[in-house]
């Protein structure tokens, strides 16, 4: 059964991670990671660590190879982070795999931005727009939530007549 790990109400320490593949992207990725630090700080969350991870190839499961994924897991344990925040856009399956690996909540940049908008929405219309954006973001992440019911047999109802 698939389990959605909810963000704790109060995340105190987050570890920031940015994965890049081309060495020429390192400077740009560092700048984006610094910007992500400011975004996360705006939510009142302390930064436990910032890590720029170089990966040779893009992999479907974790975005990086399993060796680099284990390295990120160890870094999260070492800095005692409550949450791992990725600068990269994670697919729903990648987010699930990371949550299983690090056993903490895992979010990406888009979710951080949605949280900031949600906190700053003042009007009813703004609140509804943010809620719609959150639902659109969450929908693919819930797609496999009820898989445990897929293999249950169909109950046929027959009338007594």
Model-based region annotation:
Residues 147-156:
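Short E/K-rich amphipathic alpha-helical oligomerization segments
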Residues 157-161:
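Conserved small/polar residues in nucleotide/adenosyl-binding loops
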Residues 140, 144-148:
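Canonical P-loop GTPase G-domain recognition
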Residues 112-130:
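Short alpha-helix plus adjacent loop in nuclease-associated cores
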Residues 1-115:
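N-terminal accessory targeting/assembly segments
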């Amino acid at each position: 059964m698939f389990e959605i790990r909810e963000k704790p109400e109060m995340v105190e320490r987050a570890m920031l991670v940015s994965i890049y593949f081309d060495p020429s992207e390192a400077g740009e990725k560092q700048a984006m990671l610094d910007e992500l630090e400011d975004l996360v700080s705006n939510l009142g969350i302390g930064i436990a660590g910032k890590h720029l991870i170089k990966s040779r190839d893009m992999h479907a499961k974790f975005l990086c190879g399993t060796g680099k994924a284990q390295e990120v897991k160890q870094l999260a344990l070492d800095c005692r982070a409550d949450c791992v925040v990725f600068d990269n856009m994670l697919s729903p399956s990648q987010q699930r795999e990371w949550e299983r690996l690090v056993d903490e909540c895992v979010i990406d940049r888009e979710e951080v931005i949605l949280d900031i908008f949600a906190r700053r929405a003042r009007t009813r219309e703004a609140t509804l727009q943010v809620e719609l954006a959150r639902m659109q973001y969450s929908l693919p992440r819930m797609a496999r939530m009820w898989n445990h019911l897929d293999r249950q047999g169909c109950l046929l109802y027959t009338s007594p007549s």
